[in-house]
Amino acid sequence: MKVLGRYKNGNYDVTLLSDGTKIRETEDDEFIPDFAESMDIKLTNHCSLGCPYCHEGSTPEGEHGDILNEKFIDTLHPYQEVAFGGGDVTSHPDLIPFLRRLKERHIIANITVNQYQLYNEKELIQRLVDEQLIYGLGVSLMVLTDEFIETVSQFPNAVIHVINGIVLPEEIEEMAGHNLKLLILGYKELRRGNSFLREHLEQVEKNKAWMKEHLWEYVSKFAVVSFDNLAIEQLDVKNYLSEEEWNEFFMGDDSEFTYYIDMVNRQFAKSSTAPFDERYPLMDSCDDMFEKIRKRKHE
């Protein structure tokens, strides 16, 4: 397995491998970072798909972030990870020069696209992979088909994103056994996600209940199954793991090692689901933003 990079952060060392594995090592009892290991960054609010549960509220009229001119980009540390989403990141006119700039500074970039964006922009995405402008590729599932499984399988570092409450039991069952990587996201009750939940509450709760009861029957049938922190809470993941397993696999609470940046509205917060009154104006330093988020957490 290829080592992408190693760096020291506070009282511990981090090793990043080409398959997405992250290894933290310390001689102390806890990991105390000096800077964020990773950031979830929104590049654009433009998207033509109109998903009814989109917590970002993206639209065809949505604006792009001014991604080439934000000062904090020049304060990123080598081998920090940045996960770019939207909106439709492939629609941003400055995406390639932006990613090239990050590559020159040894920043590990990942993007998330929708299933249909993967189909429509496959050549662009393949180019980003071939030029090592991105390493991780998240693909949000819309409708499970054989074509989807076949297309995703062509990208070794692709991870299928599904939403707890939206993904159907039969989709989990059909994806199992294909050596796929799966990320389960918690259902976000924000923007269009709120209105969708009101209209489809019974079905969403039914899907959530199935996931909580049956998911663990299928975990071994995927190459990897991971969760965001909201899904960990909604699915009570900790209850299904031993203390040793939890300590090995849990990567930390929101704002402990990560935070969220919205380059469209020029704001940052502990996560993309943070209340609107807990989002702050963008600063010129990524470390200053992380420090502010951490201070708020401990207040």
Model-derived segments and their meaning:
Residues K71-P78:
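A short, Lys/Arg-enriched amphipathic alpha-helix followed by its capping loop at the start of a domain
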Residues D28-L68:
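Canonical Radical SAM [4Fe-4S] cluster-binding loop centered on the CxxxCxxC motif
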Residues F290-E299:
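Cysteine/selenocysteine-centered motifs that mediate thiol-based redox chemistry or coordinate metal-sulfur cofactors
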Residues K71, D94-E104, E123, R127, ...:
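Alpha-helical scaffolding segments of alpha/beta enzyme cores, especially the outer helices
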Residues M1-I41, W246, E256:
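N-terminal [4Fe-4S]-dependent radical SAM core
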Residues G50, G86, V264-N265:
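Residue-level recognition of short loop/turn positions
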Residues S38, E56-D66, Y79-H92, L102-N120, ...:
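Core AdoMet radical
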Residues L133-D284:
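Radical SAM enzyme [4Fe-4S]-AdoMet core and its adjacent flexible, acidic
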